[in-house]
């Protein structure tokens, strides 16, 4: 079995189209989309329209939950931008998406962790300061990953949310985060102020294959016209997103929490 795994598209249509072109060349059996699909100052409605036409296995992320449930005055700007531009059929599609998904064949999907769409699975934020004096983010320990797995025992668990491509073996389970298709850096205030940065503007996704020895993962980087996406963000008065899209780092201004 060959799976293409994507997550955290955040309405970045040109990044999605570039990844889709690569996926089509891999002859995969299934494409899995792990949520946070449309929120952001880019192309939410166009992204939703493209994905609704795909027969992908898709779950919702925290941003789908927020833009569907929160009143407009309590939404963050990324969710509010998307919510104002989505058609009714887009909202119905998002509302029907499950929070988690058991694909069978030993594959289980969540956005954050099995328990929460806001929890980091393979990273841990600590109050310890890194070299630039900011709270640090480190790879989660084996014990932390095992605790976050909870009762899930599938051989392959797919997660997103942190935008960081990473994989970790925990006993008999391989946990894979494909990174973000649409936004390579953001910062957040919880549980401590921190940054998640890939350090490059590429779209990220993963190719996961089952072999005799078990599941194997290839983390993929896809080039696309990120300058076009950055200019779109600037046109929508989101210089923070433009910086992240161009560099893979939080730049002149902070990028709102978009995990």
Model-derived features: where do they sit?
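Glycine-rich phosphate-binding loop signature in dinucleotide/nucleotide-binding domains
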Residues: 23-28, 103, 150-153, 207, ...
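Active-site environment of divalent metal-dependent phosphoester hydrolases
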Residues: 10-15, 39-42, 64-68, 102, ...
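Core catalytic region of metal-dependent phosphoesterases/phosphodiesterases
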Residues: 2-95
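Acidic, His/Gly-rich catalytic cores of divalent-metal-dependent hydrolytic chemistry
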Residues: 168-259
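Active-site-proximal beta-strand elements of phosphoester/diester hydrolases
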Residues: 2-10, 106-113, 175-179
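Anionic-ligand binding region
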Residues: 139-167, 171-176, 188-190
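Active-site-adjacent alpha/beta core region of enzyme catalytic domains
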Residues: 95-120
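Active-site-proximal loop/helix segment associated with metal-binding centers of metalloenzymes
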Residues: 112-144, 184-185, 247-248
